[in-house]
Structures are given as C-alpha cells and as structure tokens.
C-alpha cells in the first residue's frame, strides 16, 4: 500500500510538471499585442460564408454518379 501511494504521488507530480510545461504563461508582449479588430472578424466571417456557398453550389451542380453492373450469370448444374 505504501509503494502504490508513492507511485501515485510520483505520477501526479510528473503530470503536473508536464501540464505546466504545456501551457506557458503569457508575458507582457502577448497581453498587449493587437489580435485583430472586430472589422477583421466580420470580413473573415463573410469570406467563410462565401466559400461555403460556393462549395454548396459545386456539390449541387456536380453530375450524379451512376453505376452499371454487368448481368449476373447463374450457372446451375
């Protein structure tokens, strides 16, 4: 029981260490950086909607595929 407790504590410590390395804290440069205006977001949204509409039109105008299967021969002995 004592060994399993130590192993659990070790795994917890390693997990916390890895978690802290995965998400570094933001520094002052990241906090003050301009990430974009609302206008940019609106323009991006419009562009995405346009691309989705074009994709939908391409799918609608695409010819439907059909398959021709050869006749099945059944041989009876």
Swiss-Prot record:
Question: Which residues lie in the propeptide?
Answer: 23-58, 73-77
Entry comment describing in which tissues the protein is expressed: Expressed by the venom duct.
- Coarsely, its chief localization is secreted
Which keywords fit this entry according to its UniProt record? Cleavage on pair of basic residues, Secreted, Signal, Toxin
Q: Where is the signal peptide?
A: 1-22
Subcellular location(s) of the protein: Secreted
- Give the GO molecular function terms: toxin activity
One GO cellular component term, please give it. extracellular region
Question: What function is annotated for this protein?
Answer: Probable toxin.
The record's family statement is: Belongs to the conotoxin H superfamily.
Q: Which named protein is this? A: Conotoxin Vc1
Q: Which organism is it from?
A: Conus victoriae (Queen Victoria cone)
